């Protein structure tokens, strides 16, 4: 039988390191609650970033996934994770920096690791809104479910990267800084609404699940955390269109209090005509436009 999460970490002398952005969770009931929020189905293929001392890892494995692949950069955690693997052979451990992982390649590795043979579906019609601008005329039959307590310093970057590969993802249930979760879920004309809100909501259905107090971690961070769930929409946007939305929102929200016709004039000289054609009030500010408004601007450019 495995020791408790805290005792297991102590036995391996694994203490949280600031350089890795580590704040460990030793409360198994909280880990179970996170997994419940994901609605993880049996026989899913799961990805976890930064398992650390393996608390969330254990809770995921107890749900009988087909496989769980964990990405860990801290060598000190590997012996501990390998001990968990002795009880759960469907655990795959990869020592790597999460920012260097390509989800497309990783998904193929996950499939191969469980001997999963997939069939190619009949290709669907390609549109500029579907993620087919990189030659993806063949639909992908395998997807991963991502469940992770993400390091704060790379969390937002990972979310954006994964959203660009949404066709490979069933859902993402993530622990992030509470402020970041509020930005992901924010509605127009609110203080938290911004670029992250627009991009996330154009690609996925987003839902804040619950807050997590600093006292749930060791050591306690200075801020609250929260759990957010993102479920990619059925027809993901193309990479080209996402990049265009990123470009537009970067300009728009750089001058948050400027009118949109002023913020975007360097990108689109005839911005007044474009906004008029789309029936968007050109006196609106960046925070007043809904995600779909930004998408319509991107599509017409």
Curated annotation (Swiss-Prot):
This chain belongs to which protein, by name?
Ribosomal RNA small subunit methyltransferase A
- State where S-adenosyl-L-methionine binds: 23, 25, 50, 72, 97, 149
InterPro entries xrefs: KsgA/Erm (IPR001737), RPE2 (IPR022436), rRNA_Ade_diMease-like_C (IPR023165), rRNA_Ade_Mease_Trfase_CS (IPR020596), rRNA_Ade_methylase_Trfase_N (IPR020598), rRNA_adenine_dimethylase (IPR011530), SAM-dependent_MTases_sf (IPR029063)
Enumerate the subcellular locations listed in this protein's record, separating them with semicolons.
Answer: Cytoplasm
Query: Which reactions is this enzyme annotated as catalysing?
Result: adenosine(1518)/adenosine(1519) in 16S rRNA + 4 S-adenosyl-L-methionine = N(6)-dimethyladenosine(1518)/N(6)-dimethyladenosine(1519) in 16S rRNA + 4 S-adenosyl-L-homocysteine + 4 H(+)
Predominant subcellular localization, coarse grouping: cytoplasm
- Write down the species: Rickettsia peacockii (strain Rustic)
Task: Enumerate the PROSITE patterns for this protein.
Answer: RRNA_A_DIMETH, SAM_RNA_A_N6_MT
